[in-house]
UniProtKB/Swiss-Prot annotation:
Its EC number is 2.8.1.13. The active site is at C103, C200. Residues 150-152, 312-313 are annotated as: Interaction with tRNA. NCBIfam families: PRK00143.1, trmU. The lineage of its organism: Bacteria, Bacillati, Bacillota, Bacilli, Lactobacillales. Residues 98-100 are annotated as: Interaction with target base in tRNA. This is tRNA-specific 2-thiouridylase MnmA. Keywords: ATP-binding, Cytoplasm, Disulfide bond, Nucleotide-binding, RNA-binding, Transferase, tRNA processing, tRNA-binding. InterPro entries: MnmA-like (IPR004506), MnmA-like_C (IPR046885), MnmA-like_central (IPR046884), MnmA-like_central_sf (IPR023382), Rossmann-like_a/b/a_fold (IPR014729). Belongs to the MnmA/TRMU family. It comes from the Bacteria. Catalyzes the 2-thiolation of uridine at the wobble position (U34) of tRNA, leading to the formation of s(2)U34.
Length: 373
């Protein structure tokens, strides 16, 4: 039996059930485990309760239960500078960012990893649903989590080989239901705590209200592609490509009863374009350009390959051909895709392996840019 007692693993503990079970499993496997709670946002809910304080209490309770030391570290400045400023800049540019991808890259697996090293860590571990597998050459491959509905490799797609070399994902081979069962069997304080949703580290806020605190909204016209005025929009930043709800136009306009969707944005004229039908022609594209292209293991500077890709979380994979040129790529779809959204991540897969990805800049239909920014 392997003796893990001399291997120190620092676990990022959020106060949720996933990271609690992560720490428990590592402790049971004999590792030298330390729990660390990251405070990344100065957060008070509508009742005046600082949710981070409540979460830290849960971390402390679980750490005491399983018998590990625990600490709290403050990354509010790093989060603001590296994630939140990016988040706001993307919205200013009319895009729809994915802060969770950047949060993993810059906070959980950079700032936190650096802090863990000061504690003498050999590895860090988190409660993400993903797997790491080392090949005979020592290269680490990141694989999808066994629970297809919970797989989080999409959000981990910007991690480097160096980061993956130092990372463990103890939940990767488990189903979410099994994780809950483990927590309940062990009587963990977080066993019945509901999963958090919402923006990475910001939680379940009213998004429109939250965003308006930082970016002034500029109302403008809502138009169809052929120029019909459909009323007023509340501010381009509040809408994303393919969005159905919140338009306030129902079925009263147009000759049929199909629902209305956001099909494009014109940032320079502050126009929101809408159209009827889930598969409205303006929503369909057959290629995209992406930047910040990054692979989880070493790849050539310029090459072309076929793989599958996701353009948003929880969507089925689509077959694509990727033409890589440095940190940029053209991604050509085997079948037309709906609502490709600038600012979101495109993530590449080879079977179970997540190869990496990039950020979507523009979608194209037959070589012509879609009216998305």
């Amino acid at each position: 039996m392997t003796d893990n007692s001399k291997i120190r693993v620092v676990v990022g503990m959020s106060g949720g059930v996933d990271s609690s079970v992560t720490a428990l499993l590592l402790k049971e496997q004999g590792y030298d485990v330390i729990g660390v709670f990251m405070k990344n946002w100065d957060d008070t809910d509508e009742f005046g309760v600082c949710t981070a304080t409540e979460d830290y209490k849960d971390v402390a309770a679980v750490a005491d239960q399983i018998g590990i030391p625990y600490y709290s570290v403050n990354f509010e400045k790093e989060y603001w500078d590296r994630v939140f400023e990016y988040f706001l800049a993307e919205y200013r540019a009319g895009r729809t960012p994915n802060p969770d991808v950047m949060c993993n890259k810059e906070i959980k697996f950079k700032a936190f990893l650096g802090y863990a090293m000061t504690l003498g860590a050999d590895y860090v571990a988190t409660g993400h649903y993903a797997q790491v597998k080392r090949d005979e050459n020592g290269t680490v491959h990141m694989l999808r989590g066994a629970d297809n509905g919970k797989d989080q490799t999409y959000f981990l797609s910007q991690l480097s080989q160096e980061q993956l070399q130092k990372t463990l994902f103890p939940l990767g081979h488990l189903q979410k239901s099994e994780v809950r069962e483990i927590a309940e069997r062990a009587g963990l304080a977080t066993a019945k705590k509901k999963d958090s949703t919402g923006i990475c580290f910001i939680g379940e806020k009213n998004f429109k209200q939250f965003l308006s605190q930082y970016l002034p909204a500029q109302k403008g016209r809502m138009m169809t592609i052929d120029g019909r005025d459909m009323g007023e929009h509340a501010g381009l930043m509040y809408y994303t490509i393919g969005q159905r709800g919140g338009l306030g136009i129902g079925g009263q306009h147009g000759g049929d009863n199909q629902p209305w969707f956001v099909v494009g944005k014109d940032l320079s004229q502050n126009i929101l374009y809408v159209g009827q039908g889930f598969y409205h022609e303006a929503l369909m594209s057959n290629s995209l350009d992406a930047s910040v292209i990054h692979f989880t293991r070493e790849m050539p500077e310029e090459f072309t390959f076929e793989c599958t890709a996701k353009f948003r979380y929880r969507q089925p994979d689509s077959q694509v051909t990727v033409h890589v040129r440095g940190d940029k790529a053209e991604v050509v779809f085997a079948e037309p895709q709906r609502a490709i959204t600038p600012g979101q991540a495109v993530v590449f897969y080879d079977g179970k392996e997540c190869l990496g990805g990039g950020m979507i800049d523009m979608a194209y239909k037959n070589g012509q840019p879609c009216q998305y920014i």
